[in-house]
Amino acid sequence: MAKRKLNETDEPSVVTEPQTQKKTKKSSTEKKEKKEKKSKSQSVKPQEEKPEATQQQAQQQTEEEQELEQQLKDEQKQQDEKDEKKQSEKDDADLTFSDLGLDPRLVQAVAKQSFEKPTLVQRKAIPLALAGQDVLCKAKTGSGKTAAYVLPVLSGILKRKATDPTPFTSALILVPTRELADQVHKAIDAFSAFCTKDIQSAKLTDNVSDAVLRSLLANAPDVIVSTPARAWHNIESGALSVAKLQYLVLDEADLVLSYGYDEDMENIARSLPKGGVQTTMMSATLVSDELDTLKGFFCRNPTMLDLKEEFSNEDEKLTQFYVKCGEDDKWLISYLIFKLQLIKGPCLVFVADIDRAYRLKLFFEQFSIRSCVLNSELPINTRIKIIEEFNRGIYDIIIASDERSEVFLEDEKTEEKKEEQGEKKEGDEKKNGKGKKKKGRRDQEYGVSRGIDFKNVAAVINFDMPTSSSSYIHRIGRTARAGRAGIALSMVVPHDLFGKHKPTSIKQCEKDEKVLAKVMRQQAKLNRKLEPYNFNKDQMEAFRYRMNDALRAVTKVAIREARTRELRQELLRSETLKRYFEENPHELSHLRHDGELGTKMRQQAHLKHVPDYLLPQDGKNALTETQIGFVPFKKQGDDKKTRGKKGAKGGKGGHGKYKKGPGGRKNVLKTFRVRK
């Protein structure tokens, strides 16, 4: 019984224990659920309190994400465009002239000229011109602009003549200078070498009569090369017909306007057929005002090509220097550069005017430095011949007068005021009868710093700084052409040294520092830099006395005589001997243009050689022990042995020493006879 009671008491204990646990668990779970509900209710309450702030944040996040996505898309698009551009440039670099769609005969002529691949200007401009579009191209000098407009013009004429062989003037090429006209005409002849029967060209810049030009134009040449003034003169007279003109080209377009051809260009534009002339304009520098003027004259809707950024690799081969020096130091530095051969190779020296060019030439002659002068007073045939011979390596130094650089003055308003004041003064002088004598006639269509293709020029020296940064660009563009290396050296007169040396001072040098500042700013935009030209001034001073001796000998009278003498010689050569040299071309090589002009000038033999004591130590070591140097008073040949030989043999007029013979000298004492 006791056991049962124990069991009975045990059983309910076993049963009742989990019930109490369940109750405690339920109570704990209920408490937890209540706490969670409270926490949830607490967390929900602030969201319900600020729904607007969260929406704004969400909108901002979505907008930022969209902006980031758009930026990524734009960057990817730009990268794709760059990759496509690089790929297209690679593909374009592999193009040949036959791939451009030119006539096969022109491609054959191009191959004969040793042109391997088209340049960037040619790759971009030729397809546009062949498609009939107006092209306005801005590219650096020496980039092949001439072929870029000549080849599509010739190709279009050949294509037209295949179906319509009617002869008429199809193309008119306008250039600012006679020298450039001759160069373009020669390029046309070279490119049309295999189609001479189909293409006829003419140049209107020669000094011939109107009757000769009329007979030349009567055959209706396909291509005419001329300056605007000559072209309008022949159009106005009826000798040149432009009624069916298809192509118009302006080479060095900005210079055409700067040379004062505005009125001629406007007249030519009026005479052209409306809406049917394809226009191409080429230049290395084009200002917006000039663009607007030219567009108003000729272009409908031109395609702009600005290719200046593509030539950075070639620009690295052009090294630019400047040296700040006094006006007399210019002559000393020039003497040292050429006499000591600090710069080797063909050089172009630019000066401000013609008198200065001849003064520098006569100065160089004192030191036996040969050079030739290129200026507007020389006949056109002589100027062309000098350029050709320089390109063939006959001359090493050309001194070019760049009077035309004045037309690039950037402050046009002040320039117009000066011209108006000058016109008023001239009018007053004419009224009073006090006008000065008219200066020598100069060719208004002369220009050497623009467009002329000087070949293999090692250095360009700005003996006198140009008047504008634009003119500077075209001067230095004569060197470092077609991927070759070159040097540009500019001599700048500081404002505090201006006018200190009056015999060599000119007014143009007063603004040298301002022009240099403009040039440096312009070159900085093109990622180029002008560096100072460093040299040892102490060593330079040792040569100053020689420079002063030579400079004193070059007087104004000597300069005037040299100018008149060369003009007389060149006129005789150009007119009288022109036919003779055409019949005897081998004798043309004997006609040189770098001969001495200062025949009546005081000659100083000691200046023609540099003594070794003036040279630095390296120069002295270069002389060997056997080289004794220059002996100025040593006589050539043994005069003592030759003197009197004619007399000894009885020659007529000899100076024998008391020898017998018809021509010998007689001893007066031995032949003396006393009269009886």
Curated annotation (Swiss-Prot):
Residues 70-90, 410-432 have a biased composition (Basic and acidic residues). ATP binds at A139, K140, T141, G142, S143, G144, K145, T146. Its main location: nucleus. It is an enzyme of class 3 (hydrolase). Its EC number is 3.6.4.13. Residues 317-541 form the Helicase C-terminal domain. It catalyses: ATP + H2O = ADP + phosphate + H(+). Coiled coil: none annotated. GO terms for molecular function: ATP binding; ATP hydrolysis activity; DNA helicase activity; DNA/RNA helicase activity; RNA binding; RNA helicase activity. Residues 642-663 have a biased composition (Basic residues). Keywords: ATP-binding, Helicase, Hydrolase, Nucleotide-binding, Nucleus, Ribosome biogenesis, RNA-binding, rRNA processing. It is found in: Nucleus, Nucleolus. InterPro entries: DEAD/DEAH_box_helicase_dom (IPR011545), DEAD_box_RNA_helicase (IPR050079), Helicase_ATP-bd (IPR014001), Helicase_C-like (IPR001650), P-loop_NTPase (IPR027417), RNA_helicase_DEAD_Q_motif (IPR014014). Residues 1-97, 410-444, 633-676 are annotated as: Disordered. A motif (Q motif) lies at residues 95-123. A motif (DEAD box) lies at residues 251-254. Residues 126-304 form the Helicase ATP-binding domain. Gene3D superfamilies: P-loop containing nucleotide triphosphate hydrolases. GO terms for cellular component: nucleolus. GO terms for biological process: maturation of LSU-rRNA from tricistronic rRNA transcript (SSU-rRNA, 5.8S rRNA, LSU-rRNA). Belongs to the DEAD box helicase family. DDX56/DBP9 subfamily. ATP-binding RNA helicase involved in the biogenesis of 60S ribosomal subunits and is required for the normal formation of 25S and 5.8S rRNAs. PANTHER family: ATP-DEPENDENT RNA HELICASE RHLE-RELATED, DEAD-BOX HELICASE 56. The Q motif is unique to and characteristic of the DEAD box family of RNA helicases and controls ATP binding and hydrolysis. This is ATP-dependent RNA helicase dbp-9. It comes from Neurospora crassa (strain ATCC 24698 / 74-OR23-1A / CBS 708.71 / DSM 1257 / FGSC 987). The lineage of its organism: Eukaryota, Fungi, Dikarya, Ascomycota, Pezizomycotina.
